[in-house]
C-alpha cells in the first residue's frame, strides 16, 4: 500500500462519458476512515441548487447520491472505488466538484 498517495486518483469511465448531459467516473476513496457522515454530507451538499440526478455505486450497490443515509449504507471504505453517474445540465460542474473532494480525501489527508 502506498498510504493513500496513489498517482491515479480519478479514473474516468470511457472518457468521461458525455451523452446528453451524462457523465460517469470512478473515484478511489483516499481518506483512511472511508465515507462516513461528514464526507457523505459533503457529497450531498455539492448537489444543492444543481439540476441533475446522481448515483453512487460501490461493490455492486447503487444509491441516490443526494441522500446522506443512502451514501452511508454503501459502507464505502479506504481504497475502495466508487462509481459516480450524473445526468443533467449541471453534470460537468458537479463532477468537477466531486473530483476535487474525492481527490482531497474529503479534507482528511
UniProtKB/Swiss-Prot annotation:
The name this protein goes by in its record: Phosphocarrier protein HPr
Source species: Chlamydia trachomatis serovar D (strain ATCC VR-885 / DSM 19411 / UW-3/Cx)
Pfam family, one: PTS-HPr
HPr domain span: 22-109
Keywords annotated in UniProt: Cytoplasm, Phosphotransferase system, Sugar transport, Transport
Gene Ontology cellular-component annotations: cytoplasm
Family affiliation: Belongs to the HPr family.
Active-site residues, Swiss-Prot/TrEMBL: 36 (pros-phosphohistidine intermediate)
Keyword Transferase: no
Amino acid at each position: 500500500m502506498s498510504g493513500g498517495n496513489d498517482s491515479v486518483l480519478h479514473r474516468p469511465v470511457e472518457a468521461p462519458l458525455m451523452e446528453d448531459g451524462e457523465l460517469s467516473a470512478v473515484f478511489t476513496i483516499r481518506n483512511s476512515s472511508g465515507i462516513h457522515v461528514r464526507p457523505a454530507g459533503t457529497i450531498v451538499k455539492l448537489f444543492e441548487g444543481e439540476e441533475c440526478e446522481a448515483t453512487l455505486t460501490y461493490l455492486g450497490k447503487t444509491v441516490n447520491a443526494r441522500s446522506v443515509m443512502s451514501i452511508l449504507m454503501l459502507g464505502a471504505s479506504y481504497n475502495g472505488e466508487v462509481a459516480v453517474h450524473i445526468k443533467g445540465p449541471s453534470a460537468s460542474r458537479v463532477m468537477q466538484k466531486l473530483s476535487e473532494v474525492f481527490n482531497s480525501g474529503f479534507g482528511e489527508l
